[in-house]
Amino acid sequence: MQFKKLTEQSLAGKRVLIRVDMNVPVKNGVIGDDTRIRASLPSILHCLKAGASVILMTHLGRPTEGEPKPEDSLAPVARRLSELLAQEVKVIADWQAGIDLKAGDVVMLENVRLNKGEKKNNEELGRAYAGLCDVFVNDAFGTAHRAEASTHAVAQFAPVACAGVLLAAELDALGRALEAPARPLVAIVAGSKVSTKLTILEALADKVDQLIVGGGIANTFLLAEGKNIGKSLAEADLVGEAKKVIEKIRAHGGNVPLPTDVVVAPEFSENAEDTLKNVADVTRDDMILDIGPDSARVLAEIVAKAGTVVWNGPVGVFEFEQFSHGTRTLAEAIAESKAFSIAGGGDTLSAIAKFGVTDRISYISTGGGAFLEFLEGKELPAVAMLAARA
């Protein structure tokens, strides 16, 4: 996919409008995690260094359009950004009449979700945003799967529309992983439900050499292979779909390596007693909460030989120590592998952080829903608009 990049633009003396994703957790005016704010810095600093003035826009939470409340304000975000940039960043609520800026200034439009028509991708609002700038930059991969005025309409009407540092890196990494992957391509798709990831499983079935499934998804696949899973979380009504995915992968020489040994417990709790069992020995009162060491070893060997690894979801209840070993083994194997690795999704990122391998994953995706939709092969509207403007 071709699109213009911020790093290729001439910016001196220009007004640059950047759609960032600074939707951070805020409680009583205090930011809980500023990762997304820091992730936006490369694009902002690039513009400032080039002699531009910068206008930022982002959403925060889920406010009601046209009804501003104090808790919906970006003031805490602007404060934190001011600290990181070591310069004042003002929040501008009344920007429609224009903004007075000089080179080196950074300002932030108030929460875009307060603007009427934002979520409906209103053309008039998009034109109003576009009228503020010489160059529009989308640097918010996390919202790329939504067509909204601050991600889509604005890109249609701005004089120039391009991808920021973060978005360009994200698209390059995803393209490298899925559009022209080094083989073997190994995908790890785990989670509690097949139903939420079924379209991803179906889309990947045509592409991957090995599809590793985990969690409730693996239990449904074990059912599809005629195994007893006791009272484990699974979706019996989707066994047919699981069988189709397995058949599809095996038809082109790929495989779905299912666990041969598992860690079970009588209940789902932090204090549940864990027991290692062969899959064939699972009884009706067992809950499968992790893969066993033999299965983990097999998966680690698959990952070691991979050319590309795409990881979405832990293979066990890693939050509980006794059920964390499968995910730990897998995380460490990915970290040690020479493969190009990309990981995304909240639980996956938590697992990566817990096991201390963050710096050894080739690329960590910032987008939850957008990452999943890219895996599904869906067009991301905000990215498609950048491509149309290239």
Swiss-Prot record:
It comes from the Bacteria. ATP binds at K197, E319, G345, G346, D347, T348. Pathway: Carbohydrate degradation; glycolysis; pyruvate from D-glyceraldehyde 3-phosphate: step 2/5. It is found in: Cytoplasm. GO terms for molecular function: ADP binding; ATP binding; phosphoglycerate kinase activity. Substrate binds at D21, M22, N23, R36, H59, L60, G61, R62, R113, R146. The keyword Transcription regulation does not apply. PROSITE patterns: PGLYCERATE_KINASE (PS00111). Disulfide bonds: none annotated. GO terms for cellular component: cytosol. SUPFAM superfamilies: Phosphoglycerate kinase. It holds the Pfam family PGK. It catalyses: (2R)-3-phosphoglycerate + ATP = (2R)-3-phospho-glyceroyl phosphate + ADP. GO terms for biological process: gluconeogenesis; glycolytic process. Keywords: ATP-binding, Cytoplasm, Glycolysis, Kinase, Nucleotide-binding, Transferase. It is an enzyme of class 2 (transferase). Its EC number is 2.7.2.3. Belongs to the phosphoglycerate kinase family. Monomer. This is Phosphoglycerate kinase. It comes from Laribacter hongkongensis (strain HLHK9). The gene is pgk.
